[in-house]
């Protein structure tokens, strides 16, 4: 997978309950959104900052 491939993945919150605020790219809207990540598992469509999300997936 390339870095851009993660932009196509749906956000997965994972099964844990840490409630970490992260950003994920929403391919349907074409925007990065703030979401809650559980802290374990999930996939690569998860970014610590909006800037990281935008830099990876903007204009995708």
Curated annotation (Swiss-Prot):
Expressed by the venom duct. The keyword Disulfide bond applies. PANTHER family: BPTI_KUNITZ INHIBITOR DOMAIN-CONTAINING PROTEIN (PTHR10083:SF374), KUNITZ-TYPE PROTEASE INHIBITOR-RELATED (PTHR10083). Residues 7-57 form the BPTI/Kunitz inhibitor domain. InterPro entries: Kunitz_BPTI, Kunitz_BPTI_sf, TFPI/VKTCI-like. GO terms for cellular component: extracellular space. The cysteine framework is IX (C-C-C-C-C-C). The record marks 17-18 as: Reactive bond for chymotrypsin. It is found in: Secreted. The keyword Cell membrane does not apply. GO terms for molecular function: serine-type endopeptidase inhibitor activity; toxin activity. Residues 1-2 form a propeptide. This is Kunitz-type serine protease inhibitor conotoxin Cal9.1b. It holds the Pfam family Kunitz_BPTI. Belongs to the venom Kunitz-type family. Disulfide bonds join 7-57, 16-40, 32-53. Keywords: Disulfide bond, Protease inhibitor, Secreted, Serine protease inhibitor, Toxin. The lineage of its organism: Eukaryota, Metazoa, Spiralia, Lophotrochozoa, Mollusca. It comes from the Eukaryota. Gene3D superfamilies: Pancreatic trypsin inhibitor Kunitz domain.
